């Protein structure tokens, strides 16, 4: 049962994290009559602009997080970022709080160690070789064992922060320092992974719903500096590789538990599929589903967490997304060139309405459909390039 917002019978959902992905989740929640409460570390975040009400707190502060949940008494708590005091969610879930998909899933995936050990050591899934390191000495020893090239990441980071590829041991000291600067909690533990010379990487959006496990068509993407630049759907792959990918994704999602959409990241090399990472929430590369599917990843996430069925997912054909990435400093961001950006057939644009920029930030995404993937990617890139950001 779902009541009406602002009434005694309202179904209340609290978003922990109010960025561009949280904004789309909020929109889908409101389409089904849910009262939305936005929480983030800074004011006027994208989802806050459309939520029924919002709060600014440090979500890594356990006392502050507990206090805001006890104040609002939400029926659902939906983590949309990793930088949260997850132990508080675990404790409150034991007291009866409904955390999406589960507090355990949120805690396991907030750092790379928890999910990697679950995938490789508990579930026995194929992954790259890896070591976790607390000191620079351990770090150098791990590089010696794995060899170069190898990949270094803080165990807690997002959007590529602190990640680097070591192609020669002379780069080790710089990579260690960069990883220490890029972690969400400051310096700390890192993972050193063997470099898989993959043919391509995919995000397999996997939904655990009341009527079973469902998959979106695989999404291909291009990364730069650890963050996505373009994504496309469907990624061409053989039926055998797709089946292997779905089997891996199913095992991970079922092990994490709960209802919701999960972004499962996989590497493909020939006929081999390797598990990389998973997010228990909509994935940035999945922004392409805003134009490629009848139900976007956000709509699917909301259906699942509300306990509603997903009878089918229709994919419209070759589609792509390209980010609007800007570098600068401003608290008065404006946009020009929108008419040119939207002049071509089957193009759409999402501007995230982020309140400020200080450095490099993703401010929007262009979306396109076309006769084939290459054409769709080029159309999305062309559209994104025509958006002019004025400071």
Swiss-Prot record:
Under the heading Pfam families, the entry gives: ATP-grasp, PurT_C, RS_preATP-grasp-like
- Top-rank taxon of the source lineage equals Bacteria
What the record says about family reads:
Belongs to the PurK/PurT family.
Q: Specify the species.
A: Shewanella sp. (strain MR-7)
- Please list the residues that bind Mg(2+): 265, 277
Gene that produces this protein? purT
Q: InterPro entries under this entry?
A: ATP-grasp, ATP-grasp_carboxylate-amine, ATP_grasp_subdomain_1, PreATP-grasp_dom_sf, PurT, PurT/PurK_preATP-grasp, PurT_C, Rudment_hybrid_motif
Annotated ranges, domain ATP-grasp: 117-306
Listed under GO biological process in this entry are:
'de novo' IMP biosynthetic process
Mind telling me what this protein is named? Formate-dependent phosphoribosylglycinamide formyltransferase
Q: Where does N(1)-(5-phospho-beta-D-ribosyl)glycinamide bind?
A: 20-21, 80, 284, 354, 361-362
Which reaction is catalysed here?
A: N(1)-(5-phospho-beta-D-ribosyl)glycinamide + formate + ATP = N(2)-formyl-N(1)-(5-phospho-beta-D-ribosyl)glycinamide + ADP + phosphate + H(+)
Q: List the PANTHER family hit by this protein, alphabetically.
A: FORMATE-DEPENDENT PHOSPHORIBOSYLGLYCINAMIDE FORMYLTRANSFERASE
Coiled coil stretches, renumbered = none
Keywords per UniProt: ATP-binding, Ligase, Magnesium, Metal-binding, Nucleotide-binding, Purine biosynthesis
EC number assigned by the record: 6.3.1.21
Matching PROSITE patterns: ATP_GRASP
Function field: Involved in the de novo purine biosynthesis. Catalyzes the transfer of formate to 5-phospho-ribosyl-glycinamide (GAR), producing 5-phospho-ribosyl-N-formylglycinamide (FGAR). Formate is provided by PurU via hydrolysis of 10-formyl-tetrahydrofolate.
Gene Ontology, cellular component aspect? cytosol
Annotated HAMAP family: PurT (MF_01643)
**What is known about its subunit structure?**
Homodimer.
Q: GO molecular-function annotation terms? A: ATP binding; magnesium ion binding; phosphoribosylglycinamide formyltransferase 2 activity; phosphoribosylglycinamide formyltransferase activity
- Annotated ATP binding lies at 112, 153, 158-163, 193-196, 201
User: Which pathway does it take part in?
Assistant: Purine metabolism; IMP biosynthesis via de novo pathway; N(2)-formyl-N(1)-(5-phospho-D-ribosyl)glycinamide from N(1)-(5-phospho-D-ribosyl)glycinamide (formate route): step 1/1
